Curated annotation (Swiss-Prot):
Tissue-specificity statement: Expressed in root vasculature, root tips, leaf epidermal and guard cells, pollen grains and radicle of immature seeds.
Name of the molecule in the record: Adenylyl-sulfate kinase 3
Pfam families reported for this sequence: APS_kinase
Principal subcellular localization: cytoplasm
EC number: 2.7.1.25
Binding site for ATP: 37-45
Keywords: Amino-acid biosynthesis, ATP-binding, Cysteine biosynthesis, Cytoplasm, Kinase, Nucleotide-binding, Transferase
Binding site for substrate: 67, 70, 84, 87, 110-111, 160
PANTHER family listed in its UniProt record: BIFUNCTIONAL 3'-PHOSPHOADENOSINE 5'-PHOSPHOSULFATE SYNTHASE (PTHR11055), PAPS SYNTHETASE, ISOFORM D (PTHR11055:SF1)
Native source species: Arabidopsis thaliana
Amino acid sequence: MSTVGNSTNIFWQESPIGKTERQKLLNQKGCVVWITGLSGSGKSTLACSLSRELNNRGKLSYILDGDNLRHGLNKDLGFKAEDRVENIRRVGEVAKLFADAGLICIASLISPYRKDRDACREMIQNSSFIEVFMNMSLQLCEARDPKGLYKLARAGKIKGFTGIDDPYESPLNCEIELKEKEGECPSPVAMAEEVISYLEDKGFLQNE
């Protein structure tokens, strides 16, 4: 039985330093870049390239990688429906804290269910939640299969694998959609530049 949300006699402690002051210190605005898509669509590749490009510009970011988080924060969760919901909820809460700290948080997760991603959007200030949809075909992702997971899923060795025997619900109103070109995933630098262009246009890379 989950005890999430059942705590009593607790009170919110306000910080003496607010988000505005932290953003001024960093000369940037905190936000969450939420990268979603099938396994093998290039989420982690984009996250790493984006973080590197931001660092080169003197901007502070941090990557929340779905696999990495299952080594620690979410190591008690499996892949049942309720575990997947809790997985995304926890990551959303952590991402919210990073954004509040003034960082550009890059969350890279399959996050297959639309309602869970929308819940994270509601959790974070809407204008500070940037959903990036890696719109790569199942055929391309399965051909790439960098972790060999599709092969295992096709062989019946992995159950509930997104795109094979569990659905992926595409975003309806994402801020950025990255598509394959001529059956290939765009280059990491090209994808990162498109995201950075959006962040620049929306004023996240400076504090004014």
